[in-house]
Amino acid sequence: MSDSKEVPSLPFLRHLLEELDSHEDSLLLFLCHDAAPGCTTVTQALCSLSQQRKLTLAALVEMLYVLQRMDLLKSRFGLSKEGAEQLLGTSFLTRYRKLMVCVGEELDSSELRALRLFACNLNPSLSTALSESSRFVELVLALENVGLVSPSSVSVLADMLRTLRRLDLCQQLVEYEQQEQARYRYCYAASPSLPVRTLRRGHGASEHEQLCMPVQESSDSPELLRTPVQESSSDSPEQTT
């Protein structure tokens, strides 16, 4: 592969997109959401990122790695899985978006249907935003739009997965949020001129090199949706000084 910081040409991008199906297109659009907001197609998003010079070869490699398209990494970039892993964490992609894609790929259709029902119970307005064909990443975006999920607060999704008995996925989200809170506190502790605060919903995500981190299961989390409105409102900790 040539320079990893090189911005690929538009013809190269078009040929690459021809190799992807509609599901993979939706995942790429989700991965690009923070850096290319407002784009409704993956082509628009990639063109926007190319104009911003954020769409480097390393970013494309990381996207394809998240999609598990090792065949394209080999044929288009001449990279093995191990070679691609050397470039992870060097692009604009956030751990939050990558983790959501990983979680969604582990869910079957019945679990996704249940998650959509849980979401509509939490916020009835989501019934108009979601359909039977809505993918997991589209569910995540809908939850973001109503303030139930953000890069710094994924406890609502974790509770939903706990109800489905998908403790493996639930614990990945719990571990992620704990790490984000610890990172936020560390950044403020290292900056005496800034007030120390607990992490609040809506703050931006930070980048990590890991994709989906294995974690240990925990049994100390509350059950989901006994009182969904109250539980979702308690996810945002009080500001401290």
UniProtKB/Swiss-Prot annotation:
Gene3D superfamilies: Death Domain, Fas
Residue span of region Disordered: 212-241
Domain DED, chain residue ranges per copy: 8-78, 95-175
Polar residues bias locations: 229-241
Keyword annotations of the record: Apoptosis, Host cytoplasm, Host nucleus, Host-virus interaction, Inhibition of host apoptosis by viral FLIP-like protein, Inhibition of host autophagy by virus, Modulation of host cell apoptosis by virus, Repeat
Single GO BP term: symbiont-mediated suppression of host NF-kappaB cascade
Family annotation (SUPFAM superfamilies): DEATH domain
Coiled coil regions, renumbered to chain: none
Localization, UniProt: Host cytoplasm; Host nucleus
InterPro entries the UniProt entry points to: DEATH-like_dom_sf, DED_dom
Entry's Gene Ontology cellular component terms: host cell cytoplasm; host cell nucleus
Function: Inhibits TNFRSF1A, TNFRSF6/FAS and TNFRSF12 induced apoptosis. Directs the degradation of host NFKBIB but not NFKBIA. Also suppresses host NF-kappa-B activation by interacting with and preventing ubiquitination of host NEMO/IKBKG, the NF-kappa-B essential modulator subunit of the IKK complex. Interferes with host CASP8/caspase-8 recruitment and activation at the death-inducing signaling complex (DISC). May lead to higher virus production and contribute to virus persistence and oncogenicity. Also participates in the inhibition of host autophagy by interacting with host SH3BP4.
Subunit structure: Associates with the death-inducing signaling complex (DISC) formed by TNFRSF6/FAS, FADD and CASP8. Interacts with FADD. Interacts with host TRAF2. Interacts with host NEMO/IKBKG (via N-terminus). Interacts with host SH3BP4; this interaction plays an important in the suppression of host autophagy.
Protein name: Viral CASP8 and FADD-like apoptosis regulator
